[in-house]
UniProtKB/Swiss-Prot annotation:
Membrane topology of the entry: Multi-pass membrane protein
Keywords, sorted A to Z: Cell membrane, Ion transport, Manganese, Membrane, Transmembrane, Transmembrane helix, Transport
Gene field: mntP
Keyword Cell cycle: no
Keyword field contains Membrane: yes
InterPro entries in alphabetical order: Mntp/YtaF, Put_MntP
GO CC annotations on file: plasma membrane
Lineage of source species: Archaea, Methanobacteriati, Methanobacteriota, Stenosarchaea group, Methanomicrobia
Role according to the record: Probably functions as a manganese efflux pump.
Record family assignment: Belongs to the MntP (TC 9.B.29) family.
Protein name according to UniProt: Putative manganese efflux pump MntP
Paired cysteines (S-S): none
Example GO molecular function: manganese ion transmembrane transporter activity
């Protein structure tokens, strides 16, 4: 049981890094409703990081044949588009930046950052490992990382100004490049 808890925590921290980075970038563009947005982002990212391992475990290997041909290209495009928009907006004087307030953007980002969690669930199914406890741990860690990512991004933006929005955009583009290298090339 201790091994499962420890390995689940390590996996959870690894999976939560993308959610944290996206939340940090989104928090950089926030002007108000900071705590509400942090909670909402935490719920979205936490839920999908929790649900995807369960889904992966439930459907097992066949889903990889559906996702492999195009899924990661969509994820890469999403990160490039949103990151590029943040960078563009920081130079064009657009104060909006990336909005974590809209549920559509949050939904897309939460799904995009939880693809790896789906693969974790599939892996658990292949080795016959129970998935509920790891999924709960993964979801809670993702909630916490996302919540604090929004707060940290907002705080840093008040110190660094639009440089933080540029950094946030660069972070999202780098996540896209990471997906491109790991899954598409």
């Amino acid at each position: 049981m201790t091994d499962l808890l420890l390995s689940s925590l390590v996996i959870a921290v690894g999976l939560a890094m993308d959610s944290f980075s996206v939340s940090l970038a989104g928090g950089a563009a926030l002007k108000d409703n900071i705590v509400k947005t942090a909670v909402t982002a935490g719920i979205f990212f936490g839920f999908f990081q929790f649900a995807m391992p369960l889904l992966g475990w439930g459907i097992g290997v066949p889903i990889t044949q559906v996702i492999d041909p195009f899924g990661y290209w969509i994820v890469v495009g999403l990160f490039f588009f949103i990151g590029g928009k943040m960078i563009w907006d920081s130079f064009s004087g657009d104060e909006e930046g990336i909005s974590l307030i809209g549920w559509k953007v949050l939904l897309l980002l939460a799904v995009a950052t939880s693809i790896d969690a789906l693969a974790v669930g599939i892996s658990f199914a292949l080795i016959g490992e129970a998935v509920l406890l790891p999924a709960v741990i993964i979801g809670v860690v993702a909630f916490l990382f996302s919540f604090f990512g929004v707060l940290a991004g907002h705080k840093l933006s008040s110190i660094l100004g639009n440089k933080m929005q540029i950094l946030g955009g660069v972070i999202l583009v780098l996540i896209g490049i990471k997906f491109l290298i790991e899954y598409c090339l």
